[in-house]
């Protein structure tokens, strides 16, 4: 028995399923989860001393790699001053200033820069950020209905688990038990990338719709970017009907571009360009905390000022703006310069090419989806129009992934334990770590090709 197996058995005695987040249980790939005990640079090490190239990277935050010395020192220095005060600290303002300044695209032809985040409220988790954004949208508009897209994951609050991605997709769940029908009925789910469905919903329910929430680029059902012009038209439909557009950048924010996916999608576009769009509210997580629990919601000042203590929409949190966590986030964002984003894109380019080569040589049918440095693969022949929505993602040959995953794991590469999750590279990936992944791919591709569907 491995030490990981022994530790996992102990965990199952006192923790439901042995994990504190379902996807970690290896439910869709089988086998025993590795108990990780150490991480540095592009590597993680398990309780048995086995080292892996990490393509999970804490599900997104570790864009610099693990245990970056400057981040570790910032955390140590902050902890030495106190783990928490229950009061506002200067670093919270610094982080809010950094985000409001960073989330911008340069003006075109002399027009001013576009800056959608005028004010920011810090929370501890992405779920809190999206939950609060929904409450704020309802409080600001005085309306009750919410529109979301099938396969988009916005955390595990009651309003947002309907036809969600991430662990809900991994476990093949329709949503979650424990959500009253009255709450579920306030969320309208439509197919992603389907503007006709959006227009139909607004035609029927427009005066009651508080907001449309969308992942800036879907990354929790695999990576599925919006079709060209989709989000811009979505914003127009929402605004024409007096509703708000909420862009969920918990996963994409500060990972795919210095200004998140909004920056990637709007860079170089004038404000009046047909494909330009500006959200009313944005949610952040992952990278903004540098690996510690920080998330945020931001947006238009007139909307944000409806939050207490200025307005009637209540939100609070004992650990919101925790000084140690904020120190990690501040330092990570300050270090995430153009060289970091260049390194992320290069690593993604190399790995995508290597996977495609291995899959082609193994005779696999597949599709690759990408948003900046985020990418994923689906097994099976894609439809002619490509992978554009939850239905096409779910139709893939998911049964090939466990064989692929375990072959990579056995060769020292840690991938997300679900075909519905993105691969995360880090700027710490060097020639040696990339080479280990590349050398592992041919055998893993052959294992996937040899897999058979369950009886």
Swiss-Prot record:
Entry annotated with the keyword S-adenosyl-L-methionine: no
Pfam family, one: Aminotran_3
Primary site of residence: cytoplasm
Pathway entry: Porphyrin-containing compound metabolism; protoporphyrin-IX biosynthesis; 5-aminolevulinate from L-glutamyl-tRNA(Glu): step 2/2
Reactions catalysed according to its record: (S)-4-amino-5-oxopentanoate = 5-aminolevulinate
InterPro entries attached to this UniProt entry: 4pyrrol_synth_GluAld_NH2Trfase, Aminotrans_3, PyrdxlP-dep_Trfase, PyrdxlP-dep_Trfase_major, PyrdxlP-dep_Trfase_small
Any GO BP annotation: protoporphyrinogen IX biosynthetic process
Cofactor: pyridoxal 5'-phosphate
Protein keywords: Cytoplasm, Isomerase, Porphyrin biosynthesis, Pyridoxal phosphate
N6-(pyridoxal phosphate)lysine modification, residue list: 286
Assembly notes: Homodimer.
Record family assignment: Belongs to the class-III pyridoxal-phosphate-dependent aminotransferase family. HemL subfamily.
HAMAP family linked to this entry: HemL_aminotrans_3
PANTHER family according to UniProt: GLUTAMATE-1-SEMIALDEHYDE 2,1-AMINOMUTASE, GLUTAMATE-1-SEMIALDEHYDE 2,1-AMINOMUTASE 1, CHLOROPLASTIC-RELATED
The name this protein goes by in its record: Glutamate-1-semialdehyde 2,1-aminomutase
Gene: hemL
């Amino acid at each position: 028995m491995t030490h990981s197996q022994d530790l996992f058995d102990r965990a199952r005695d006192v923790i439901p399923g042995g994990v504190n987040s379902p996807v970690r249980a290896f439910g869709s790939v089988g086998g025993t989860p590795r108990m990780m005990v150490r991480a540095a640079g592009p590597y993680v090490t398990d309780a048995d001393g086995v080292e892996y190239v990490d393509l999970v990277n804490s599900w997104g935050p570790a864009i610099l790699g693990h245990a970056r010395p400057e981040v570790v020192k910032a955390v140590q220095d902050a902890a030495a001053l106190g783990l928490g005060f229950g009061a506002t600290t200067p670093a919270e303002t610094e982080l809010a200033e950094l985000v409001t300044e960073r989330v911008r695209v340069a003006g075109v032809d002399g027009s001013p820069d576009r800056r959608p985040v005028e004010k920011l409220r810090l929370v501890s988790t992405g779920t809190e950020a999206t939950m609060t954004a929904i409450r704020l949208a309802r409080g600001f508009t005085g309306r009750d209905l919410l529109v979301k897209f099938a396969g988009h994951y916005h955390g595990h609050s009651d309003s947002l688990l309907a036809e969600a991605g991430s662990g809900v997709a991994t476990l093949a769940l329709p949503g979650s038990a424990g959500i009253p029908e009255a709450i579920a009925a306030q969320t309208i789910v439509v197919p992603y990338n389907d503007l006709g469905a959006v227009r139909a919903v607004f035609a029927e329910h427009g005066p009651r719709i508080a907001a449309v929430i969308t992942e800036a680029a879907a990354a929790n059902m695999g990576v599925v970017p919006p079709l060209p012009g989709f989000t811009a038209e979505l914003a127009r439909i929402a605004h024409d009907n007096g509703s708000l557009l909420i862009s969920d950048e918990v996963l994409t924010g500060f990972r795919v571009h210095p200004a998140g996916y909004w920056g990637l999608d709007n860079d170089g576009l004038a404000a009046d360009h047909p494909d330009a769009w500006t959200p009313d509210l944005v949610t952040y997580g992952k990278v903004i905390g540098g690996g510690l629990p920080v998330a945020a919601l931001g947006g238009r000042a007139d909307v944000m000022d409806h939050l207490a203590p200025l307005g009637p929409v209540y939100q609070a949190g004992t650990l919101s703006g925790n000084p140690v966590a904020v120190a990690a986030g501040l330092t990570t964002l300050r270090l995430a310069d153009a060289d970091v984003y260049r390194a992320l894109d290069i690593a993604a380019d190399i790995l995508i090419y290597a996977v495609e080569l291995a899959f082609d040589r193994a005779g696999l049918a597949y599709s690759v989806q990408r948003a900046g440095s985020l990418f994923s693969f689906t097994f099976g022949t894609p439809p002619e129009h490509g992978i554009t929505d939850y239905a096409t993602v779910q139709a893939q040959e998911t049964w090939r992934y466990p064989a692929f995953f375990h072959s990579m794991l056995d060769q020292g590469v840690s991938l997300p334990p679900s075909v519905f999750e993105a691969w995360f590279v880090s700027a710490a990936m060097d020639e040696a770590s990339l080479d280990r992944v590349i050398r592992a791919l041919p055998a893993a591709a052959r294992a996937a090709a040899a897999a058979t569907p369950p009886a």
